[in-house]
Amino acid sequence: MNTVRETIAAIATAQGRGGVGIVRLSGPLASQAGQAITGRTLTPRHAHYGPFRDADGLVLDEGIALFFPGPNSFTGEDVLELQGHGGPVVMDMLLQRCLQLGCRLARPGEFSERAFLNDKLDLAQAEAIADLIEASSTQAARNALRSLQGAFSKRVHGLTEALIALRIYVEAAIDFPEEEIDFLADGHVLRMLDDVRSELSTVQREAGQGALLRDGMTVVIAGRPNAGKSSLLNQLAGREAAIVTDIAGTTRDVLREHIHIDGMPLHVVDTAGLRDTDDHVEKIGVERALKAIGEADRVLLVVDSTAPEASDPFALWPEFLDQRPDVAKVTLIRNKADLSGEHVGMEQSDDGHVTITLSAREDDMGLDLLRDHLKACMGYEQTAESSFSARRRHLEALRQASAHLEHGRAQLTLAGAGELLAEDLRQAQQALGEITGAFSSDDLLGRIFSSFCIGK
């Protein structure tokens, strides 16, 4: 049920100059505003070309007006779109005209929020709009579109329906003890529960892949000066993103580059060489490098394989281990194999540490090994056509639902406690409901929609 009565307006197209710009309105004043601006009564879902006029009848622009009466519109309310020339001054004049007619400026994401509140789409679909706009690769855009079309929501709804059926069976047995249903002897509850757990595990895995394509991972390149860190960044980026010289300390600040490997986004950070220095600026760069190391998903510790001290790379900089105690997330890169004559390849020690020997000067000397290794570190798989976009909050909700099902199963098998199982099933259903918005606090909704673009 729609309780929003204000009419909102915003420029729906990106800032800057363009061939076409769109001002969008939603609310009860949309039809009246369209008539005032165009001077005619707009036929629903028809394109009307003509002048857009101000309050004095002067022409502001010429373009197309489209009116979509609710509830058959994106927001579920009356919607007006004014498509004119995409100059910022023209768009601003047209927007100001709408505000003069009683509209107010829309908040970021408010159009999508109204669509959600009016049951035109659920929360996961609304978030997919933002993900589609922000997609940084073809596969990420395809996944976001599938989520917008309801692929993710359908999977969640399927899990929810299965949980509801299971809850009905369990709670009926609790409420009618005279039926004397033995949960364990019956076996029906455990079979249903395990089926839900299996499907939930599949959705978790697919959602994890979707989140990878959306968020990617942060990879920090660290090491001594002149180890070849910037050359490695340039090879991964496929361009001269960093300055490369023989002068130690050329890189004095963190340099960030956004790249893709088979569609997976990587945020690669090149850092200042790790060494003791009296240079104030370089010292700041080293401090920032250590900070980046501590925040990374994966660290590539680059060593010059021709240097005498390369035999014990972790001893080169003791503070490195202080910043990154989980050495399992550090990959040792023995660089300059073209000079040292070392065999190009990848080795994994008994304790799980990975060493890759390569040359950052030559793309065919170990770079493909590194790319495959980075994909494997994040558990990346070539995305199937059925995949969808997901966010970290979705993964957390799925994790919580899984934890409740695991706990409920343990309560049933160890103690035969049907009442405790029923409560865990309820909480699992609520966790899934947070994904689609069936159970979401106002604070959560506010945070989600405030991250959208204005006009969306």
Swiss-Prot record:
Cofactor notes: Binds 1 potassium ion per subunit.
Keyword annotations for this protein, in alphabetical order, are: Cytoplasm, GTP-binding, Hydrolase, Magnesium, Metal-binding, Nucleotide-binding, Potassium, tRNA processing
Q: Which residues bind K(+)?
A: N226, T245, I247, T250
Q: What class of enzyme is it?
A: hydrolase
Q: Which residues are (6S)-5-formyl-5,6,7,8-tetrahydrofolate-binding?
A: R24, E81, K120, K456
Please list the cofactors this protein needs: K(+)
Subcellular location(s): the record lists: Cytoplasm
The record's EC number reads 3.6.-.-
Pfam name, any one: MnmE_helical
Annotated TrmE-type G domain residues: 216-379
Q: Which GO terms describe its biological process?
A: tRNA methylation; tRNA wobble uridine modification
The main place the protein resides is cytoplasm
Q: Where does GTP bind?
A: 226-231, 245-251, 270-273, 335-338, 359-361
Which GO cellular component terms are attached?
Answer: cytosol
Record's keyword annotation contains Nucleotide-binding: yes
Q: Which Gene Ontology molecular function entries are recorded, alphabetically?
A: GTP binding; GTPase activity; metal ion binding
Superkingdom field = Bacteria
Subunit composition?
Homodimer. Heterotetramer of two MnmE and two MnmG subunits.
Give the function comment from the record. Answer: Exhibits a very high intrinsic GTPase hydrolysis rate. Involved in the addition of a carboxymethylaminomethyl (cmnm) group at the wobble position (U34) of certain tRNAs, forming tRNA-cmnm(5)s(2)U34.
Similarity field: Belongs to the TRAFAC class TrmE-Era-EngA-EngB-Septin-like GTPase superfamily. TrmE GTPase family.
State the name under which the record lists this protein: tRNA modification GTPase MnmE
Tell me the name of the encoding gene.
mnmE
